[in-house]
Amino acid sequence: MAIYLDFENHIKEIQNEIELALIRGDEDAKEILEKRLDKEVKTIYSNLTDFQKLQLARHPDRPYAMDYIDLILKDKYEVFGDRHYNDDKAIVCFIGKIDNIPVVVIGEEKGRGTKNKLLRNFGMPNPCGYRKALKMAKFAEKFNLPILMLVDTAGAYPGIGAEERGQSEAIAKNLQEFASLKVPTISIIIGEGGSGGALAIAVADKLAMMEYSIFSVISPEGCAAILWDDPSKTEVAIKAMKITPRDLKEAGLIDDIILEPSKGAHRNKISAANTIKEYFLDTLRTIQQDPHFLDNRYKKLMSLGSFVESMPH
């Protein structure tokens, strides 16, 4: 059963009317209602607030990394473990083919259903997850395979055990090593891009965001609690933080925005997966045709956060 957000109530009502028309066999009513539905969808989704985009990024039906992997990766083989401590189910690593091109895919997976969410730690990786990702990145480099990374996490797991095993070191090591990988790397934020937990697999030649995803240094709720000591200020925090793809593209922090199907990726997972596949293939071709892609990656990373300070007269 489809889950509708509060701002989608009119869409839900029209959809229910369409289903009733189908039961009655009333094709004329169905056609009229479908046109009305299309108009309503365009009106709502062309005027979304940043808070509503955050709701879409966290939608329980939104495609996760495993959904996309199952749809676009063929002849896939999952790789486990970090060769140091354990296998972190919050990060998945696969070898396979996208359109007959051998690739390595690394993704953050939140899981569906209570049992699976607990197994995946709600998509919050431990250090062994980031070390597993680095192990696979080095494997890809050794065998000259391009890397696709799918980012979707509220953040790195903040537990005591994670800190004892070097959470910050694991993330920092990934930032360092991914920056110098000698193979094409493409990272896509498919839902939530939460702070260092996202950055650990977001250093790439090209960093893209799905249309209704977010990327931030802290959750808006956390920001509201720290700055205003008031959770009701979440919407104010979102505006101030500039966490949407459009804001981040304007700031030069991401390279591309991947458009989603009408009503969001959760309403048409196959279409969303095909869009990601085409983006990956097109971007990969562009990177492979550039003999200086490593230099360009380095220049891009070094330019992040740079600014010019005017001297007082």
Swiss-Prot record:
**What SUPFAM superfamilies would the database entry show?**
ClpP/crotonase (SSF52096)
Any one Pfam family match given in the protein's UniProt record, by short name: ACCA
Q: Where in the cell is it found?
A: Cytoplasm
**Keywords tagged on the record:** ATP-binding, Cytoplasm, Fatty acid biosynthesis, Fatty acid metabolism, Lipid biosynthesis, Lipid metabolism, Nucleotide-binding, Transferase
Query: Biological process (GO) annotations?
Result: fatty acid biosynthetic process; malonyl-CoA biosynthetic process
User: What PROSITE patterns does its record include?
Assistant: COA_CT_CTER
Gene3D superfamilies assigned = 2-enoyl-CoA Hydratase, Chain A, domain 1
Role noted for this protein = Component of the acetyl coenzyme A carboxylase (ACC) complex. First, biotin carboxylase catalyzes the carboxylation of biotin on its carrier protein (BCCP) and then the CO(2) group is transferred by the carboxyltransferase to acetyl-CoA to form malonyl-CoA.
- Assembly mode: Acetyl-CoA carboxylase is a heterohexamer composed of biotin carboxyl carrier protein (AccB), biotin carboxylase (AccC) and two subunits each of ACCase subunit alpha (AccA) and ACCase subunit beta (AccD).
The record ties this protein, via NCBIfam families, to: accA (TIGR00513), AccA_sub (NF041504), PRK05724.1 (NF004344)
- This protein's name: Acetyl-coenzyme A carboxylase carboxyl transferase subunit alpha
Tell me which species this is from: Helicobacter acinonychis (strain Sheeba)
Please name the gene that encodes this protein: accA
